[in-house]
Structures are given as C-alpha cells and as structure tokens.
Swiss-Prot record:
Any GO CC annotation of this UniProt entry: synaptonemal complex
Name of the protein described by the UniProt record: SUMO-conjugating enzyme UBC9
Domain UBC core per the UniProt entry, residue ranges: 4-157
Glycyl lysine isopeptide (Lys-Gly) (interchain with G-Cter in SUMO2) cross-link site: 18, 48-49, 101
Residues carrying the site annotation Interaction with RANBP2: 4, 25, 57
Consequence the record notes for mutating residue 127 to A: Impairs catalytic activity
S-S bridge residues: none
Pathway given in the UniProt record: Protein modification; protein sumoylation
Subcellular location: Nucleus; Cytoplasm; Cytoplasm, Perinuclear region
Region of interest called Interaction with SUMO1, as start-end residue ranges on this chain: 13-18
Gene: UBE2I
Covalent cross-link site, Glycyl lysine isopeptide (Lys-Gly) (interchain with G-Cter in ubiquitin): 18
Organism: Homo sapiens (Human)
Amino acid sequence: MSGIALSRLAQERKAWRKDHPFGFVAVPTKNPDGTMNLMNWECAIPGKKGTPWEGGLFKLRMLFKDDYPSSPPKCKFEPPLFHPNVYPSGTVCLSILEEDKDWRPAITIKQILLGIQELLNEPNIQDPAQAEAYTIYCQNRVEYEKRVRAQAKKFAPS
C-alpha cells in the first residue's frame, strides 16, 4: 500500500471527524483483525431537504486505489439507486470521479460526498449510466419523482 495514499486518507479521516456536513457519514471499514482499512470507507449521503430525495439516507462505498490521490476513489451505492447517473452496479457516474475528466488530487472526501448529493437531485442527462431511470427522467418527470420519493422512504434511517 502506498504511504502517500494512507497518509492522505488519515488526514481526510481526521478532517472529517473534526468537521463534516450534518447527516453525512464517512467511516473507514475494519479489517478482520480489527485494524482500520483506510482504503475502503462506508459512507452515507442524506437526501437534500426540499427535494424528492429528502428523508432518505443512501449508503455508498468509497474504494481507494494505491495511487490515490492521483486517481479518484470508486464510489458505489449499496444497494444501487434508481438514478440516471448511477450504473446498474451502483457505481456513480460523475465527472469529478473520473481521472480523465474533472478529478483533481486536491478534491476531498467531503467535496465528493457533497457533489454526489447535488447530483442526486440534478442528474447530468449528457452522461446517462442507467437506461430506465434516464428514460423516465426525460419522458415523465412526475413518475420519476414518485419513484425517487418511494426510494427515499425505503432508505429512511430507522
């Protein structure tokens, strides 16, 4: 494992614990031996107030490669969400998460999670990743928002 990646992720964890947006979660997972795995984080993004996503808490896994922060983490909703920019596998399609697009090593975990929260309610229809959600979003916004509200209710924190 890269010392650069681990040191950056340790800084990220410290900064997150000191200050993070209300309702968001970002925690490194534990290895079988109980030690912390900084390369694999369990996160959760709350649906934004005043949107059909409100009330939901959407679980996301963030996986970092050894060359982080040169390369972005892979962000994957578990379980996958109904959304035009979420692949059926759950992987998020967002330009700041793509090395050859808008990724920059200075982007923080907090910025990534806030960017994904923004994307939930403002899909990028130029870059669809899920045919069904994309089609319904474009053709029947009322039905799309109904499905999103049902999903938010399903993923409401207990």
